[in-house]
Amino acid sequence: MKAMRESPRRLLAPFALLAALSACVRYHPRPLSPRRSAAAFQTRRLDDAKLRVFLSDYGRAPKHWPKRHWNLGDLILVALYESPELAVQRARWQVARAHVITAGERPNPRVGFLSQHHSMAPEGVLPWTLGFSFDIPIETAGKRGDRIQKAEALADAARFQVGETAWQVRVRVRQRFLDLWATTEQARLLKTQAQLRERLLKLVEQRFAAGENSAFAFNSIRLGWRRTQMTLSATEAHVARARAALAQSLGLPLGAIAGLHFDFTNMNHPFAGQYPPLTTLERVALRHRLDLQAALARYSAAEDALKLEIAKQYPDVHLGPGYEWEEGDNRWSLGFSISLPLLNQNQGPIAEAKARVVAAAATFTALQARVIGQVSQATTGYRGALKTLQVTGGLFEAQRKSQRLFEQRFATGKIGLVTLLKERLAFFAAARDRLIALQQAQQALGALEEALQYPFAKSFSLMPAMRHPSPSSLRHTHS
């Protein structure tokens, strides 16, 4: 009888051991509050101490904090620190990295418990048959390794996508910064032109009242003054919109950049060094373009998926050891089972995987062709923009010399004030033409850098975006 009492306890021991060894991850709720996240966004500032640490980590340690002047390189790092789009891509990268862990997990064994009651058991004999059995799966044909390789390739693609998003953040910041600089300069020139036209209009109006000028000349100058005023008003509105667009590209509220001073020095000097051959630029693009690297990683993942489907043709083995106790008799068993590939040999999934490999290869080839075309078009556009800038620069210098000559003639009394004012207006018109050409050259440079995904100024690095997220570089907007 003592043996009968102890045997069921021995049967229950493995289950107690399994329960003790099982480790559980507890769920910690992190509710997302739209109101709090919106309020947190409105509190973002450029004097954030964590932002200062972030800038220092990448070689832009400010001597004075908060900074008094912000240049393009500083603002790009601000955008990499604050960008919501980049935070989304980082989170997706973390999901892909977690999937590598999932892919590497081995299937857990299963345990089953058996109990049978005997209604005809002799007196004094425990009327139960007790036992348990295991199902131990064993993967074959390297399926686990194929899963891991596929997951790692997709994680690489997600990592490259983080860099691609970082580059797009850089492109948007540069475009908005350039737009703000150009519209601010346009407004400054237009304001001076408006003052000159107003002064000229008063002089011509006096002459018209005295009968010294025709009505046509007076109306023509008045119309020019009105058009300048309208253009100035529209440009000033554009300046306000450009500041708002820059704040958005930085991932900041508009109030965070109110009253900020920007350093536009580099905008006046587009890169005009010696260009390498077009084939060299194409090689640079094919080497640096992160979307190409991501497409290549996705192709590798498609190949690994095909290897996995081919490996699934070979069935996994399931070992089934078991134990039963009945009336003092200990019975052990050992069995195994496999799936018989009689009705199908996984042909459908293999065919789908093969088609995905072909599609991934076609996608990569098409992207390569598009990149080469973009580089060719952007290179031609930038060289043309530099030639236009050279021509307008020459005309501007000629107009500058002409104005100096007119200033000298006016000082000696050879010409009147009306003639001098018209010459000054011509000079500022040439200055506006040069500004437009300079803006177009900077836009063309931006298009070339975007096609190459390589900054000519070497003032930007993708490393902040490619690193693993850290507490100092990420914001938590949910509580």
Segments predicted by a language model, with ranges:
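A short glycine-centered flexible hinge/capping loop motif at secondary-structure junctions
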Residues: 208-212, 410-414, 451-455
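C-terminal structural cap/anchor segments
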Residues: 349-352, 362-388, 395
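Periplasmic alpha-helical coiled-coil/stalk elements that build and connect Gram-negative outer-membrane
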Residues: 3, 25, 144, 153, ...
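A glycine-/polar-enriched beta->alpha junction
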Residues: 81-87, 94-109, 121-124, 132-150, ...
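Terminal intrinsically disordered/low-complexity segments used for targeting and assembly
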Residues: 2-78, 236-284, 447-479
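Small/polar, glycine/serine/threonine/aspartate-rich low-complexity segments that form flexible
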Residues: 58-69, 112-143, 147, 257, ...
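Alpha-helical heptad-repeat coiled-coil segments that mediate oligomerization/polymerization in large
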Residues: 214, 371, 378, 413-416
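Metallo-beta-lactamase
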Residues: 235, 290, 437
